[in-house]
Design a protein with these regions (language model features):
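Periplasmic/cell-envelope proteins involved in peptidoglycan metabolism and beta-lactam response
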Residues: 1-168
Length: 168
C-alpha cells in the first residue's frame, strides 16, 4: 500500500509540475478544436505599437482595411488558408485566447485578448513602397530597446486578394 501511495503522489507531483510549466503550450496547441478553426486561432486582435488593428480574429480573420498594411504584415500575420504561417499568432496564442492558470480559457465576456506588437504600421508601409518590385528584406529596430519597428519580406501579396498563380 505504501508503494502505491508513493507512486500515486509522485505521479500527481509530476503532473502538477508539468501543468505549471507547460500549460500555456497545452492550451495553445494547434490541434485544440476549442480554440482553432481551419488552423486559425479563434479569438483576439493583433495591433501595432500605437494600437492600429492589424488582424482581428475574434470572428473569422479580418485584416486591416489598408491594402499596403495587409501586404506589409503578411509574413507576420499569415493568410487565411495557412499557406504562410502566422508566427505572431502562434507566439501570442495563449494570451490572445485569454488563458490564465486559474480560469483556463474561460472568459465571461467572450472577448479574446490583444497582442500589441512593436511594429509600426507606417514604417512597414514605407518600407513596402521603398522596395517597389524588388525582392528582399527590410529590418529596422531600436538598438536601445531591441524593439522591432519594421520587418518586411518581399515579394508579398494581399491576403484579401490572393493572386492566381496556377498559370505562372
Amino acid at each position: 500500500m505504501g508503494l502505491f501511495l508513493f507512486v500515486l503522489l509522485g505521479g500527481l507531483l509530476f503532473f502538477l509540475l508539468e501543468y505549471m510549466t507547460q500549460a500555456e503550450d497545452w492550451v495553445s496547441f494547434s490541434g485544440s478544436p476549442h480554440l482553432y478553426n481551419s488552423s486559425n486561432i479563434g479569438c483576439g486582435t493583433i495591433t501595432d505599437r500605437i494600437g492600429n488593428v492589424l488582424l482581428d480574429i475574434s470572428q473569422g480573420r479580418t485584416y486591416s482595411e489598408n491594402g499596403n498594411t495587409r501586404k506589409s504584415t503578411l509574413h507576420w500575420l499569415g493568410d487565411r488558408k495557412g499557406y504562410i504561417s502566422a508566427s505572431t499568432v502562434s507566439t501570442y496564442a495563449a494570451s490572445m485566447v485569454g488563458y490564465d492558470r486559474i480560469n483556463g480559457v474561460y472568459n465571461a465576456s467572450d472577448e479574446g485578448g490583444n497582442a500589441r506588437l512593436t511594429l509600426s504600421e507606417k514604417v512597414q508601409n514605407a518600407a513596402l513602397e521603398a522596395m517597389g518590385n524588388r525582392k528582399g528584406t527590410v529590418g529596422v529596430y531600436n538598438y536601445k530597446t531591441g524593439e522591432i519597428l519594421c520587418a518586411l519580406t518581399t515579394p508579398t501579396y494581399d491576403p484579401e486578394n490572393v493572386p492566381d498563380i496556377a498559370n505562372d
